[in-house]
Amino acid sequence: MSLARLATGQTGCAPGATEEPIVLVPLYPEQLGGMPTPRTGETLCGGTGADVLDGRLRLIAPETGKDVTEFHVKGARHTLEIAQIIGAQCAYLKAGSPSCDRDGVTGELLRRAGIEVIRVP
C-alpha cells in the first residue's frame, strides 16, 4: 500500500496522472503490526475490515490455525498514525488483501479517519 500526500499541501486526491507533485510513502501494515514477511494467507471470509475492527470477526491463519487479528489491527493503527503525521489525503491499497483493501482492516480504519482509499489491482 502507499499513502499519498500532495506536496503542495492541497486537499484531495486525483487518480491517475497529475501535474501536482505527490509524495508516496510505501507501507506494509501487517509487517508494522508484527507479522513476518511473507505472511500467512488469511482472508476476510464472511465479513469486512469493519467487522474485525468492531470485534465481530477474527482473522485466523489457515496454515497454523492461529488468531492473527491483533497483528492486522495493530498494523492498521500504526498506518493511521503515519498517515496522520504526514498529512496523507489518500491511500492506494491492494485489492483482495485482508488488510490492504478498501474493505480490509487498514482500509476501513483509514476511511473512518476521513482518508480517501483507492483500491488498486
PLM feature segments, named:
Residues 4-10, 89, 113:
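Catalytic phosphate/metal-binding cores of nucleic-acid and nucleotide-processing enzymes, i.e., regions
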Residues 76-84:
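Short, charged beta->alpha transition segments
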Residues 32, 50, 54-77, 104-121:
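Divalent-metal-activated hydrolytic enzyme cores
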Residues 35-36, 99-102:
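Short catalytic/ligand-binding loop motif for oxyanion handling, primarily in non-cytosolic enzymes
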Residues 8-11, 103-107:
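Charged helix-capping and loop-helix junction motifs
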Residues 94-98:
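Short, well-ordered beta-to-alpha junction loops that form the rim of enzyme active sites
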Residues 6-62:
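Short, surface-exposed acidic-centric catalytic microdomains
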